[in-house]
Amino acid sequence: MSIGLPRGVQDILPDEIPFWHLIENIARSLFEKYNYEEIRTPIFEFTELFVKGTGETTDIVMKEMYTFQDKKGRSLTLRPEGTPGVIRAYLMNKIYTTKPIWKVYYIGPMFRYERPQSGRYRQFHQLGVEVLGRKDPYIDFEVISLAVEILKSLKLENLEIEINSLGCLKCRPAYREALKNYFYQYKDLLSPIDQERLERNPLRILDSKDEKIIPLKENAPQPLDFLCNDCKDHFDKVLRYLQEASLNFKISPKLVRGLDYYTRTVFEITTTSLGAQNAVVGGGRYDNLVETYGGPSTPGLGFALGMERLILLIKQQDKIKIEKPSLFFLAIENEKYIKKAVEISKILRINHRVEIGSPNEPLRTQLKWADKLNSDYVIFINQMIEKDILRIKNFKTGEEKEIRIENLKEL
């Protein structure tokens, strides 16, 4: 029997984990400073949650979900994104009855059946935020600037915010109709999936990956030309706040994002460092999603950030050095010194990593272990310890010195 992994998944080995911790720690710190609380939702949910929220005509629902039946025949799906689960939790737990504004963040694995490529996997990890209960344009700006702050804290460069407005339920129908009329002229050029989208949700055609219709999309009607006064005022204020904060942005009239629930502001944060797949963060406003699930009228918005792609960027730009505490290897030359070795290890572990050798192995073997572990220092636990003295060897330079146990805390 050969043991392998399904395509599109990976092991995250110990050498890689410091990059994950770096991102998680920076993000958690910033989330909490912006008054977000962590939420953890199930990895699988009822399929209908995603069909209804993410959208029947999206690539995610039509082609990419991992859906299965449980032993009672219920349709379940591994979560392809984080927002629907957060909204379900908001409604099931009646958060809206106690908190007029709810700000949460999540970190965890998502699952989509798509073609694996650089920085993109079928099991991937996202961190994201959701804000429920605020419709003012300032919070759009704050959410975008929070995402930028995370990326800048990770020393990423060449960042640009791409932003658009998709309008609201009042002005969207006119835009949809114009889009439908435009693409109807080219119906025969559309794939069967895009022909279905033409009838059910023509906005999804703008998100199509079919290369044949890229030229058609260039001349398609733009949502900004159909905004009502309220949506235009909202969008103008978001842009003004970004400009006042000196954040680099450009208006992208064709940006619609790959989810059906977005309204008004949608955005991506891109970088030129990752080739074709250059969007690192994506998000937007979803003022009708809670109502879609039968809840009260509740404005909302959020973003999600792909961690695998972010780690790839961090490595490419090589601006951050991951440093571990020094590793001390305690080579025990006699079993009677184990108790002392444990006492010494407790002192050293206040600031350092410690590996304790085995007195049942020759000193030469223990030193080989120390070398294989890439130890920084070796402390020899031998008869000198009876005088409270230790011999320490710098395993990188070969330099040796003696130190009293009482001075270990100074290391």
Swiss-Prot record:
Its cellular-component GO annotations read:
cytoplasm
State the superkingdom.
Answer: Bacteria
Q: What class of enzyme is it?
A: ligase
Q: Which reaction does it catalyse?
A: tRNA(His) + L-histidine + ATP = L-histidyl-tRNA(His) + AMP + diphosphate + H(+)
GO annotations under biological process? histidyl-tRNA aminoacylation
Q: What Enzyme Commission number(s) appear in the record? A: 6.1.1.21
SUPFAM superfamilies assigned = Class II aaRS ABD-related, Class II aaRS and biotin synthetases
Residues annotated as coiled-coil are none
What are the protein's UniProt keywords? Answer: Aminoacyl-tRNA synthetase, ATP-binding, Cytoplasm, Ligase, Nucleotide-binding, Protein biosynthesis
**Pfam family name, one:** tRNA-synt_His
The protein's location, in the record's own words, is: Cytoplasm
Report the GO molecular function annotations: ATP binding; histidine-tRNA ligase activity
Keyword Cytoplasm recorded: yes
HAMAP family found in the cross-reference section: His_tRNA_synth
| Quaternary structure, from the entry | Homodimer.
Give the family, as the similarity comment puts it.
Belongs to the class-II aminoacyl-tRNA synthetase family.
Q: What is this protein called?
A: Histidine--tRNA ligase
